[in-house]
Amino acid sequence: MILFVLPRFSGGGAERVTLNLLVELYNRGHSVGVIVFDRGGPLSHMVSDNIPIYNLDTLTLTRSIVSLVKKIRQLKPRVVFSTLGYVNVAILSIRWFLPQRTKIWIREANLPSISLPNSDHSKLMTFLYRFLYRRADKVICTSIRMKNEFISKFSISDSIMHILPNPVNVDLIRISFKTIERFDKGGVCYIAAGRLSFQKGFDRLLHWFSEINNKKSTLVILGDGSLKDELMREVKLLNIQNRVKFIGFCNNPWQWYAGADVFLLSSRWEGMPNSALEALACGTPVIATKESGGIDEIVKQGDTSITIVTGPQQFIYAMNNVKTRNKDSKNDSLLPDRYKQENATLIIEKWLNEISLKND
């Protein structure tokens, strides 16, 4: 069994990536399961009734440790797969209590050089990353840049470092927007999505949007989070409330992505932004900050559907250069093939085969 570990079925990119892998591996005949501390969350619908969900019903990580050890010892999985930093640290700290043959694969969702200084208890987390991550059987990165950071700044051995492109279910996305959603007032339609948090930079995006030339342009922001009230107050202060719409969490964000003229990524840090990859799958180009993680690697491969900018004025300039597109036609996917879900799953299957060969 490949046992995935998530706190809950939250609506974040890391959770969606994990569940995409879980479902695809199940569909390809692998034995899979998922441990959660709390069964709630907007992405719970992604897991079919046939996939085992082990709900510890402990709500928080600190209350989950003992139950987590017991459940893993009971299930004896071939692999435990975790993708959130604080959960990664916890699993690595208890691995001495886990079955000896169980492999620990941890996936990092954000660039640690930027995410850790902005995290709670940043000095402690930096120490734990350096001390514990080297004890994983695989440290899975979303980009070459992230892999190089772990090797150079955390002294992690290259032998356990691996790159796994974010898996995007292009087929599901493409059939999910038979009709599109578009907040149209006669100008360019911009779209942004993500947790309403400091990391995602929506506070600065609102200021940039307020400075663009075309005052008929609109901005839709998808997602929920702790800064929602603060961002809505900022919209009123900037006097752009008639041109900005907060949708909240959306089970089908892709119809909004497909209806927009461009996707805006204003993040202060990222690993590989899943929402931007999904926007490309919808045929929608992307404007991104230089801090937006590994997405710049797509640009380096010669892709022209992504514009990386180096500062606020360059972001505004890029926004001003966007043209409205044909609203009545479905645009072809702009996503490179390596990010398709089936290709990412093949990499995991290769790793699983390597385990089998070693055990034979």
Label each PLM-derived region with a short phrase.
Residues 300-313, 320-326:
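Conserved acidic donor-binding segment of nucleotide-sugar-dependent glycosyltransferases
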Residues 249, 268:
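Aromatic "clamp/platform" in nucleotide-sugar-dependent glycosyltransferases that forms part
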Residues 4-62, 153, 225-226:
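N-terminal strand-loop element at the rim of the active site
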Residues 134-160, 168-170:
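A short, active-site helix/loop in glycosyltransferases that binds the activated sugar's phosphate group
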Residues 12-20, 188, 192-211, 226-232, ...:
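A conserved mid-protein helix/loop that constitutes part of the nucleotide-sugar donor-binding site
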